[in-house]
């Protein structure tokens, strides 16, 4: 990052890099959770659920790329090893040991709800300190809110289908 850009962030730059790295850990784990969940999914509306999980996986990977770029712009070092993801994660990882679509949806809804909280904290922390990270965090949080809504809509559709049988 340029010296003027870094100086705008000031003394909080190391804390922001730490928060971004924790979010990066979450995004990588979310990417894999969505991707592998799409591969093993079973049950009613599997096709629709798989499409949604694959789409979300792609978007989580995009978030990871945004976070890495911002960490580098701030002069930080992004997490370099997968084992660091488990040490730094805010939201953890839920292996899709039960591939039933309703279980997968619930696991991923919980992940999205955690992600929304993570990005809300980033938005709050960077609002008056780092406008670039603030805008990026707001954009990612908006995506995470949409993901939660998408998954809950699928959950509701499955429930409605069961009730109408």
Question: What is the predicted role of each segment?
Answer:
Residues 1-165:
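Iron-associated oxidoreductase/ferritin-like identity signal
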């Amino acid at each position: 990052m340029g010296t003027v850009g870094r100086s705008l962030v000031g003394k909080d730059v190391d804390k922001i890099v730490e928060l971004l790295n924790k979010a990066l850990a979450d995004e990588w784990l979310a990417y894999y959770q969505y991707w592998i969940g799409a591969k093993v999914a079973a049950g009613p509306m599997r096709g629709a659920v798989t499409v949604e999980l694959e789409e979300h996986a792609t978007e989580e990977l995009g978030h990871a790329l945004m976070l890495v770029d911002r960490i580098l712009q701030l002069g930080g070092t992004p997490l370099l090893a997968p084992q660091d993801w488990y040490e730094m994660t805010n939201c953890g990882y839920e292996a899709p040991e039960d591939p039933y679509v309703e279980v997968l949806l619930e696991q991923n809804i919980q992940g999205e709800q955690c992600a929304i909280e993570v990005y809300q904290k980033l938005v709050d922390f960077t609002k008056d300190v780092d406008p670039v990270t603030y805008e990026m965090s707001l954009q990612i949080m908006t995506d995470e809110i949409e993901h939660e809504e998408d998954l809950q809509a699928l959950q509701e559709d499955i429930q409605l289908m069961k009730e109408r049988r």
